[in-house]
Structures are given as C-alpha cells and as structure tokens.
C-alpha cells in the first residue's frame, strides 16, 4: 500500500514532463472533421476548489510543495484509522480523489485571481450547509445532500431524491466518487452522459436558438458551437429549484434561475480534456467564477448508476422517521 502511495506522489512530478510533451499533440478528429471527444472521462481531482490563503495569488505549487502536501494528506489518513469510529461511510479505497498528476494548481478556481469564490450579493440566500448536514429551512430544498426534515421526500436534498447528481452539474465539480462522464458525438449533437445520476445532456450544434425563457429545466438548456478545436457550450434557463453554486466543502448559495454557464472542452493530449467553465449569476455573486479542471481518459465502460435502486433508500429514511415518532409516542 505504501509503495503505491509513493508512486502516486512521484506521478505528480512526472506529469509535468508529460504536459510539456503534449505541446506537439495533434487533435484526433471524427468523420465530420470535428475534434473527437468520444469515450469515458474522469474528472476527479485532489486540488481544492478554493486556494488556501497562504498561497496568495500563486496559481501553481512547486513540485516539492505538491509532494509535501500529498505526503501530509496520506499521513493524516493513515493516522486516522480509528477502530472506535462508526462504519457508516467509505474508506479511502473507494474515494476517487487522485486526478491528473500534472494538475498542481493551488486551486481549481482560476478567476477571481485570488483563487477563491467571490463574495455573494447581500440578497443571496445560503440554501444549504457544508458536508450535507440537515439544516432548518423551507421548501423547495435546493441543495444536493442533507435536508430540512423528514416529513416527506420534498424535505430531502436533490441527489438524495435522485433528481440531480451532486457532482454532475452542469457544471462538473469533482467529489469523492462517481466522477465519470461519457461523451458521444454526431455532426449536429454533442451528448454528455454523466454517471450520476445517469443523465444525458444533449447539446445541439446546429446554431439553433435557446428555448423560451419561460421554460425552465433542472440542467438548463444547452447550445454548443466550435471555437477552432474547442467546443463551447452555453447553458441558461435553469429552474429556481436548484442552488446556483456549491459543493460539500463550499457554501451552497442562491438559486440557479439567473445563472448563465459557459463550458469549454479542449483536447490537450490523447488522454486529457481541459475542462473550463465560467458561471455568471448576478443574483448570487458579485463577480463571475471560472474553474479549470483536467479530465482523464478512462479505459473502460460507464455502467448504470442506479441511485437508490428503486429509491428504497429514501423510502426507508422516511419510514425510519415515522418509526422514531411512534416510539416517542409509546414512551
């Protein structure tokens, strides 16, 4: 186990050499002479979303810093193997947090320049807590994990209800697992099928206009076009029942109703897509947000993510709450 961890650390540094070699890469193309993005891709990352304040405006770690941080992370994980803790979670064997070795940025956020999310506007409402802990609030529940109670399914987070995956967006944001996506292409459509929750986003490339502004969708309405060898996808018409932006480690804020999302997909070598997105949401943030994230080619298949396999997990959550209420009455 330790030997594998050391090799993973060394891969961080060796990845820099591979990145330089990619300068000579010629983009493979489909039969329609479009850049070929087809296949299964993984967007895991061990880079934090926001830059730790100690790095200031520095975009990149030195190789020595990258090794030191990774070593400290592994040491903390090994030191935390406490047999007294509960077992209702996953261990590091199941977590997908390695990411591309050549991504040694200090943060996934590249704008603002400090690598941190811009301040929210005064009227932006925090719609959820960090780490999926239940909070007080009212319906609709716009965040992904956790909830505001257990009176009914509408009190639970969107990913608990198998409506929207907590990492699939759009946009993609790496989480602890299931950071996979499969891309299909035809001449006039670009199809993005996320592992969680097994949802396919069909992006027309035919220069058609967006749907009417009154029609609102969970994943918004996407339209794409080519900027040389980069695919640009613009998405709007999100509904007001999802958060504007947020992760397990960052506050979950606002609604997505006024959000405008621009994604850019660029092949940088045979095994990598540079994925970049910009969020503009004046109802939630005082400035735009840009994130850059490498996606790694996966030599394998994407299998169905069945969520609650019939959603009995949600049913049992509510059933357990009713039993606890009955037990309290019987005391």
Q: Model regions: which residues?
A:
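Bacterial N-terminal signal peptides
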Residues: 6-15
